[in-house]
């Protein structure tokens, strides 16, 4: 059996996450009272129609505060049944959450005539503290549109061929901000930039002319060797410590050339020695 618990602040994308999981064969329950989590898991284990039932539930600030406080104990009870359980926590910065509520004109579940929207969001953060601390995977949706969020959930949660730590090597551009959910970040902006070559400007690190240009630069090769040596040494230690997800982010200025090239090469190297290595280019469209 596989159980995914979806949580996060209101407006961060929990409904989208449940829709993606439902589209991929999960039986989904929105706003499950946290106290019912062990009972739900027990019932799913004896489900007769599915050999490996897939269940996803959302647990958020609509729960009783006393249930949320007990979440660590409840999660421990579920995992004691040897259930493959992931806790996904979605979030966005406060400015983005305020903007989303303004655009949709929906009411925050904790809002009241005597509590502003900003205060409701702050209170929600405190209530969800026990879940935040135990999240296996955190996805910040601040800069993600609906389709990017759907892709991110499918990539991180549904495309794991084998159990164990899931590694994501991701390229990005600093001009659009650092990935806030990255565990390791490498800044490669000091390397020669193909952008300043007119014939390469409109191409990306996936294109052979750009790859050939970067491969011929000694600094690029040295950077690749240093990063790959570090990752090959230390990522197995992350896996040994029972980490469910590890994100490695490689950043250049625009996220089109240097970071893409190095991310591709690093992904190829890591896939030879580690299981569940995925590659993503955040700022390539």
Curated annotation (Swiss-Prot):
The keyword DNA damage does not apply. It comes from Pseudomonas fluorescens (strain SBW25). This is Nucleotide-binding protein PFLU_0879. Keywords: ATP-binding, GTP-binding, Nucleotide-binding. Displays ATPase and GTPase activities. ATP binds at residues 8-15. PANTHER family: RNASE ADAPTER PROTEIN RAPZ. Coiled coil: none annotated.
């Amino acid at each position: 059996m596989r159980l995914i618990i979806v949580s996060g602040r209101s407006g961060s994308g929990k409904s989208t996450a449940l829709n993606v999981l439902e589209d991929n064969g999960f039986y989904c329950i929105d706003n499950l009272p946290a106290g019912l989590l062990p009972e739900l898991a027990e019932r799913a284990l004896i489900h007769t129609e599915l050999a490996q039932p897939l269940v996803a539930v959302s647990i958020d600030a609509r729960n009783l505060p006393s249930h949320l406080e007990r979440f660590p104990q409840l999660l421990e009870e579920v995992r004691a049944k040897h259930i493959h359980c992931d806790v996904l926590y979605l979030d966005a910065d406060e400015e983005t959450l305020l903007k989303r509520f303004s655009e949709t004109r929906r009411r925050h579940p904790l809002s009241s005539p005597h509590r502003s929207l900003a205060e409701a969001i702050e209170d929600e953060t405190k209530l969800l503290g026990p879940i935040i601390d135990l999240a296996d995977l955190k996805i910040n949706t601040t800069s993600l549109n609906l389709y990017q969020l759907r892709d991110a959930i499918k990539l991180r949660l549904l495309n794991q061929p084998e159990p164990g730590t899931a590694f994501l090597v991701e390229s990005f551009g600093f001009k659009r901000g650092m990935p806030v959910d990255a565990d390791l970040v490498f800044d490669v902006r000091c390397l020669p930039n193909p952008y300043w070559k007119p014939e390469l400007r409109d191409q990306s690190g996936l294109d052979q002319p750009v790859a050939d240009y970067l491969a011929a630069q000694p600094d690029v090769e040295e950077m690749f060797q240093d990063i790959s040596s570090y990752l090959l040494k230390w990522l197995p230690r992350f896996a040994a410590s029972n980490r469910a997800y590890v994100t490695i982010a490689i950043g250049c200025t625009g996220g089109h050339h240097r970071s893409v090239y190095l991310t591709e090469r690093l992904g190829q190297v890591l896939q030879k020695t580690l299981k569940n290595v995925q590659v993503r280019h955040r700022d390539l469209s």
